[in-house]
């Protein structure tokens, strides 16, 4: 029987683990610190449109606490900046009746950005990933909020760098039984690139959560990014144009909107975590721009701004409006579309 080991118990990993557990699928959640202690002692407080509940999902704090089996699937749901540490911890763990995790077990990345699957492939022989569309929040230890309805979220799931793992259909069936929409794709990098374009808005959501002009900045950031992705030979897939998945049928429960913490970057600032994914979102565009000779002044500047506020513990919206004024002025001067 397949057991899913969810590494990372934040806004993605915890809801996935809860849904799998409630659908009678074998799952273990890997959490840390106060979050792990709260889940172990009281269960995961899981807020859904039909109410809050305590989910007694099994939890461990490290690879050393778990005896890996040949039927395990490692599912990584940490922020990208934690990926290297995760791979170091788990790749060469022994697997009962086999050799090591990297040689034996499949790994699925449920993470943002373009770097995670590539990094995993350095150690793991079988790497898959998903472009994840799942509004959810982790703002306090032991609690996550998942307001999506009727399904919890949507996955575009495939093998990296292309094709499908022999077990992909079985994984998809387990996720569907757990109330997720799953679309199998054999061109995963296109879907990850499409999600990256959407995630470029995370920085503005964190810095300027209450300013309607942030939408104008996001258009300019994406216009800059599209030039970079084209130069890098990437053709982003737009999930809104997917004939097999109708995102218009997906909504957020009004009763949970006041508990939804916004983008993952805004949630990181709210928790004063000290770092964010911006280096692997806007920073990925900056990296590709430098590799392919495409200037990225807007993404570079907002990447640095997010890093500064995260370092200094500034909460969402704490930078004021002058920075947004400057960024919009820069966008206008370079001719980027903002409206």
Mark where each language-model region is.
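NAD(P)+-binding Rossmann beta1-loop-alpha1 motif at the extreme N-terminus of oxidoreductases
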Residues: 1-52
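Nucleotide donor/acceptor-binding cores
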Residues: 2, 72, 105, 153-155
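Residues at the starts of beta-strands that form the adenosine-phosphate
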Residues: 3, 26-28, 106, 126, ...
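Rossmann-like NAD(P)(H) cofactor-binding subdomain of soluble oxidoreductases
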Residues: 53-143
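Helix-loop-beta segment of a Rossmann-like dinucleotide-binding subdomain
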Residues: 94-101, 144-159, 203-210, 262-270
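Rossmann-fold dinucleotide-binding core
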Residues: 112-201
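Active-site-proximal catalytic alpha-helix in oxidoreductases
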Residues: 188-228, 252-261
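NAD(P)-dependent Rossmann-like dehydrogenase/reductase catalytic/cofactor-binding core
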Residues: 219, 223-339
């Amino acid at each position: 029987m397949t057991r899913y080991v969810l590494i990372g118990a934040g806004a993605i990993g915890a809801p996935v683990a809860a849904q799998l557990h409630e659908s009678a699928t074998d799952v273990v959640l890997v959490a840390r610190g106060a979050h792990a202690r709260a889940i172990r002692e009281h269960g995961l407080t899981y807020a859904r449109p039909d109410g809050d509940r305590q989910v007694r999902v099994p939890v461990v704090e490290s690879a050393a606490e778990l005896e890996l089996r040949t039927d395990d699937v490692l599912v990584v749901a940490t922020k990208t900046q934690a990926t290297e540490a995760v791979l170091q911890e788990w790749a060469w763990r022994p697997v009962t009746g086999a050799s090591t995790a990297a040689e034996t077990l499949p790994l699925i990345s449920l993470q943002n950005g373009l770097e995670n699957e590539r990094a995993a492939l350095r150690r793991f022989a079988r790497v898959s990933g998903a472009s994840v569309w799942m509004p959810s929040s982790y703002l306090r230890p032991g609690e996550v909020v998942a307001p999506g309805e009727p399904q919890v979220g949507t996955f575009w799931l495939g093998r990296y760098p292309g094709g499908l793992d022999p077990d992909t259909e079985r994984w998809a069936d387990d996720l569907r039984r757990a109330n997720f929409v799953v679309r199998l794709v054999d061109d995963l990098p296109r879907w990850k690139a499409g999600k990256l374009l959407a995630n470029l808005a995370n920085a503005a959501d964190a810095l300027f959560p209450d300013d309607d002009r942030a939408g104008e900045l996001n258009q300019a950031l994406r216009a800059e990014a599209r030039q970079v992705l084209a130069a890098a030979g990437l053709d982003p897939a737009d999930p809104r144009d997917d004939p097999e998945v109708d995102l218009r049928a997906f909504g957020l429960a009004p009763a949970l909107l006041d508990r939804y913490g916004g983008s993952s970057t805004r949630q990181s600032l709210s928790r004063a975590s000290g770092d964010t994914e911006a280096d692997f979102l806007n920073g990925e565009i900056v990296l590709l721009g430098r590799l392919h000779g495409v200037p990225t002044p807007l993404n570079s500047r907002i990447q640095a701004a997010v890093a500064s506020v995260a370092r200094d513990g500034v909460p969402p919206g704490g930078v004021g409006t002058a920075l947004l004024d400057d960024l919009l002025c820069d966008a206008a001067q370079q001719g980027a579309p903002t409206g």
